[in-house]
Amino acid sequence: SLFELGKMILQETGKNPAKSYGAYGCYCGVLGRGKPKDATDRCCYVHKCCYKKLTGCDNKKDRYSYSWKDKTIVCGENNPCLKELCECDKAVAICLRENLNTYNKKYRYHLKPLCKKADAC
């Protein structure tokens, strides 16, 4: 769910997920279209593509369990879809952390209409 995703992003990056990534670039947040603006935005693009592969669970509402051991996210689910959902969220959180050095505040509240046609996954 959005709750676990936000918690993972906070744990990995130390940033407030809604404020820092809620409207970042063309892909972070609700909508997604156009060319990713930078590496951080590309993380969100890949994350949206990961969600598109999920079948049988709701990425916004369905809760899953994970643990934070030695600063590492460990997904712990028996349900295959929820496990995959957790892995999608884990991957974006790690990607965002790995690209903190290129995070650009000018894309924090990027206007989505400036993002042109969709990039296919």
UniProtKB/Swiss-Prot annotation:
Protein name, as recorded: Basic phospholipase A2 homolog 2
Positions of region (Important for membrane-damaging activities in eukaryotes and bacteria): 105-117
Gene Ontology biological process: arachidonate secretion; lipid catabolic process; negative regulation of T cell proliferation; phospholipid metabolic process
Organism: Bothrops brazili (Brazil's lancehead)
Residue(s) at site: Cationic membrane-docking site (MDoS): K112, K117
Assembly and binders: Homodimer; non-covalently linked (probable alternative/compact dimer conformation in solution).
Secreted keyword on record: yes
Major subcellular location class: secreted
Site residues, Important residue of the cationic membrane-docking site (MDoS): K105, R108
Biological function: Snake venom phospholipase A2 homolog that lacks enzymatic activity. Is myotoxic and displays edema-inducing activities in mouse paw. Also displays cytotoxic activity against myotubes. A model of myotoxic mechanism has been proposed: an apo Lys49-PLA2 is activated by the entrance of a hydrophobic molecule (e.g. fatty acid) at the hydrophobic channel of the protein leading to a reorientation of a monomer.
InterPro entries: PLipase_A2, PLipase_A2_Asp_AS, PLipase_A2_dom, PLipase_A2_dom_sf, PLipase_A2_His_AS
